[in-house]
Amino acid sequence: MKYQFNVAMACDGCKNAIDRVLTRLGVEDKSISVEKQEVIVTTDKPYELVEQTIKKTGKEVRSGKVLE
């Protein structure tokens, strides 16, 4: 499954924090853009689990959707 999230990020530190938690979750295929405030992941993990994992960084997940 491929998911897209709109996440409030201010800097590369925010990006790195999200990258770390997603890597720990086992998500290898990911794109994180501070400029677009966007996180796109391709994984077999459930949507809710990925969303909650991103929220654990303290960042606001403004919206999200399943792309495919």
From Swiss-Prot:
Q: Which residues form the HMA domain?
A: 1-62
Keyword entries, A-Z:
Chaperone, Copper, Copper transport, Cytoplasm, Ion transport, Metal-binding, Nucleus, Transport
Q: Which gene encodes it?
A: atx1
GO terms (molecular function) for this protein are: copper chaperone activity; metal ion binding
Q: Which InterPro entries match?
A: Copper_transport_ATOX1-like, Heavy-metal-associated_CS, HMA_dom, HMA_dom_sf
Q: What is this protein called?
A: Metal homeostasis factor atx1
Q: Can you name a GO cellular component term?
A: cytosol
> What organism does the UniProt record list as the source?
Schizosaccharomyces pombe (strain 972 / ATCC 24843)
Family, according to the entry, reads as follows:
Belongs to the ATX1 family.
What's the source species' lineage? Eukaryota, Fungi, Dikarya, Ascomycota, Taphrinomycotina
Q: Which SUPFAM superfamilies match?
A: HMA, heavy metal-associated domain (SSF55008)
The job of this chain, per UniProt, is described as: Shuttles copper to the transport ATPase ccc2. Protects against oxygen toxicity.
Which residues are involved in binding Cu cation?
A: C11, C14
An example GO biological process term is:
copper ion transport
